[in-house]
Design a protein with these regions (language model features):
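Short, charged cytosolic
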Residues: 2-29, 175-186
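Low-complexity, highly charged intrinsically disordered N-terminal segments
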Residues: 14-50, 54
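Conserved catalytic cores of large enzyme domains
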Residues: 5, 256, 338-346, 350-365
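Single, functionally critical "micro-switch" positions that shape active/binding sites
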Residues: 88, 213, 252-253, 297
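Alpha-helical bilayer-embedded segments of polytopic membrane proteins, i.e.
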Residues: 40-84, 111-116, 170-185, 200-250
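Short, compositionally biased low-complexity segments
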Residues: 1-8, 22-26, 146-153, 311-314
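Membrane-embedded catalytic scaffold of the fatty acid hydroxylase/desaturase
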Residues: 76-200, 261-352
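C-terminal, active-site-flanking charged/polar segments
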Residues: 238-251, 255-256, 316-322, 326
């Protein structure tokens, strides 16, 4: 089934009967297919390749020296850091190794030491998202600090900030993309804030040490090699492109998809499939998006190795259609149009911007 713009739903009374567990049958089919088996050759190639390419990039940066041509290096590093972050995402989901400890340390090295993002902060936030995607009051990914993605957020912020921001919120879909230029800086700041906070953090000493080495060492290298003016622009370009790339990779996954009221309960299959959107494309897109374009498959089987997601998508799509579960997929550019249109309509105060198939799904549960 091709993707249609779908979003906010009206709260419905929770049914007392227990929802069916259609996921069990799918899990058996996927397990029998061997798609949950680890791909060590694939991941060791990517892990070693990431370290080699990063080392080459740093060496090239030093050799090129103090010149405005380094802005191209900044762009290349932004792309490389995003790809490494996506690899860390795989490790955090136990896709790379069977050993939880190996996955944890891989995530710490890739995330904290190489990219400058706290593994513990991301894991805490992302685990809650996976448990209840797009569920109001449960999913931290729909509680954005600037952009409103639910009508209640619009009402709350309008009362707090007054009518001055009315026009901005009405056009927030357009501002969403420029705001992503600040996302890279926000990710680093959130990571540092979590490490310095009193909230529980399993590897606080390691995370703090790795973050200090990465952020401090990176800034020192940039300002040693480059003059202050070029260094400042270099950092702005690198952080800006990093934030945009990260944002454009994650935004199509759930933005503009159904919002689940806090009172509504769904079985696992529908909770993951109905709130997720796949992005059609070739293998180049698979690499560019780090496998996030198979969001439905990833949410159903988070530990499935990335190279197996494409093969699993056809199997899971057929299963969903056979069980009457709406499976959404669309093109990349169309997904951005859907996201923009939805965020704008929420900003204008529309309570139910699109016809949502979740109501029909609820009737069948």
């Amino acid at each position: 089934m091709t993707g249609q713009p779908t979003t906010g739903i009206r709260a419905t009374a929770a049914r007392t009967d227990r929802p069916p567990n259609d996921f069990t049958g799918l899990a058996k089919v996927v397990a029998a297919s061997g798609l949950m088996h680890r791909r060590y050759g694939y991941y060791w190639t990517k892990l070693i390749g990431a370290v080699v390419v990063l080392a080459a990039a740093v060496a090239g940066f030093v050799l090129i020296g103090d010149t405005w041509w380094q802005l191209f290096t900044a762009a290349a590093l932004a792309i490389l850091f995003t790809q490494i972050a996506m690899l860390g995402h795989d490790a955090a989901h136990r896709q790379i190794f069977v050993s939880g400890r190996w996955n944890d340390w891989t995530s710490l090295i890739l995330g904290n030491l190489l990219v400058g993002m706290s593994y513990g902060w991301w894991q805490h936030k992302h685990t809650r998202h996976h448990a209840n995607p797009n569920k109001i009051g449960s999913d931290p990914d729909i509680e954005l600090p600037v952009v409103s993605v639910t009508p209640d957020q619009v009402d709350r912020r309008a009362r707090r900030y007054g009518p001055v921001l009315g026009w901005v919120m009405a056009h927030q879909g357009v501002f969403f993309y420029p705001i992503l230029l600040l996302e890279g800086l926000s990710l680093h700041a959130s990571s540092v804030r979590r490490v310095l906070s009193r909230e529980p953090l399993r590897h606080r000493a390691v995370e703090g040490s790795f973050l200090a080495m990465r952020i401090g060492g990176y800034l020192a290298l940039v300002f040693i090699v480059l003059s202050p003016g070029i260094a400042a622009v270099f950092l702005a370009v690198q952080l800006g492109i990093f934030g945009v790339y990260m944002g454009l990779s994650f935004a199509p996954n759930h933005k503009g998809m159904p919002l689940v009221p806090a009172s509504v309960k769904l079985d696992f299959l529908r909770r993951q499939v109905l709130m997720s959107r796949n992005i059609r494309g070739n293998r180049l897109l698979d690499v560019a998006m780090g496998g996030l374009n198979y969001q439905i498959e990833h949410h159903l089987f988070p530990s499935m190795p990335r190279p197996h997601l494409r093969r699993a998508s056809g199997m899971i799509k057929d299963y969903c259609q056979a069980h009457g579960v709406h499976y959404t997929e669309t093109g990349l550019l169309e997904s951005y149009r859907i996201v923009t249109r939805y965020i704008n309509r929420v900003g204008l105060g529309e309570r139910d911007p699109f016809q949502c198939p979740l109501l029909q799904q609820r009737a069948a549960v």
